[in-house]
Amino acid sequence: ILAAMSSFRNLFLATFLLAVSSIGGSAQKMRLDYKVEANIIAGGGEYTPFYLMNNRGGTVSFTPNTGYLRAAVMKDIDTTRRFSYGFGLDAMASYNDDVPAYIQQAYASLRFLALGLTVGSQEEYSLLWDKALSSGGWVWSGNSRPIPQVRIGIPEFVNFPWTHGTVQVKGEIAYGRFVDDKYQRHTHGAKENYTTGLLYHRKNLLLRFGKTNKRFYGIVGIDMAAQFGGKTYKGNKLVLDFPSDIKQYF
């Protein structure tokens, strides 16, 4: 175990130093956030307790006696500017997990006024609730690794015109692709059906009524997520081929 953790530590240091050196020349002109994290979970039983895995973005393995090392560098969007950008690179090395090392987050974001665009894999949280107090929504929860996607819309509440701040709106639309084809084939391909090339879609729209500095305000909205496209196999035999032309995107 110690030898494995030592090799993970060396890998992390190399990844972190590479990330820092690649943007070090611009560090004085922007605010960068750096993070280095270690996590170890030990115990008996067949699985890791759910409350230790919940809202962790798939970083904690369901197998017991596991751990990881994590290093990240990020720049947040500056909401005080008309135009701003952000990015993130988050690498992980794990012990007693299916994958020994992987990129957890890699994304770039642009913001112009209220409009936002994000491309890549970024951890997401509940649309409304405090991420530390909620186990997630019925539609989506943060218990799996981020899905590579393109997301565009109004990511934060903004005042709706002509309402004097009593009505705010936010909403986004996203398309992405699942990247667990090899994992599905390896774990299910021999005896069970598995799907490759699966696509992802999500859209939401929320309206907030009342001013947040008052005692009461209300929120109504809709949130929808779906999987579409892809091909289902059993072994090497094609079972189903789901359509993924332009009609399915809408």
PLM features per residue range, with description:
Residues Q28-G67, D78-L89, G171-Y175:
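Transmembrane beta-strand segments of Gram-negative outer membrane beta-barrel proteins
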Residues Q28-D33, K75-G86, R111-L115, F157-K170, ...:
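Short loop/turn motifs that connect adjacent beta-strands in outer-membrane beta-barrel proteins
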Residues E46-M53, D98-Y102, W129-G136, D181-A190, ...:
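Outer-membrane beta-barrel translocator domains and adjoining extracellular loop/strand segments
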Residues L69-K75, A106-F112, V119, V150-E156, ...:
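Residues on the lipid-exposed face of transmembrane beta-strands in outer-membrane beta-barrel proteins
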Residues P155-F250:
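Signature for the C-terminal beta-barrel architecture of outer-membrane proteins
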Residues A38-E46, I77, A91-Y95, F112-A114, ...:
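Transmembrane beta-strands of outer-membrane beta-barrel pores
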